[in-house]
A protein has these predicted regions:
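Gly/Ser/Thr-enriched, mixed-charge loops and adjacent short helices
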Residues: 1-102
């Protein structure tokens, strides 16, 4: 591990026959199931217009999390457009890891 200086040095050839891309239908089923386990649907109903600011911080939750919040009934979901772009470089944040103190 300590000898790898760049991710491009890792040579991996995956078996494409074993990779199955899941699509919107799986996301929809997941969200449908997720909404059945709400701990307090009444509270969500009372506070559905509560302002929720969500950012995936350049991760992959950009579509699924807002869709899940909407499915729960929240109506005032605000996203951070600059951080909606999926990027492992995290160009808009100083430290993307919350376990590390910001510089």
């Amino acid at each position: 591990v300590n000898k790898i200086r760049n991710a491009s040095e890792i040579k991996f050839k995956g078996n494409k026959e074993l990779i199955e891309i899941i699509g919107q239908a799986i996301d929809d089923e997941y969200i449908k199931e997720l909404t059945t386990i709400s701990l307090s649907p009444e509270a969500i109903s009372r506070h559905k217009d509560m302002k929720i600011v969500y950012t995936p911080i350049h991760g992959t939750g950009v579509k699924l999390v807002p869709a899940a919040l909407k499915a729960y009934g929240f109506t005032n979901i605000i996203h951070v457009p600059e951080q909606d772009v999926v990027s492992g470089d995290f160009p808009t944040v100083i430290s993307p890891n919350p376990e590390e103190p910001a510089v």
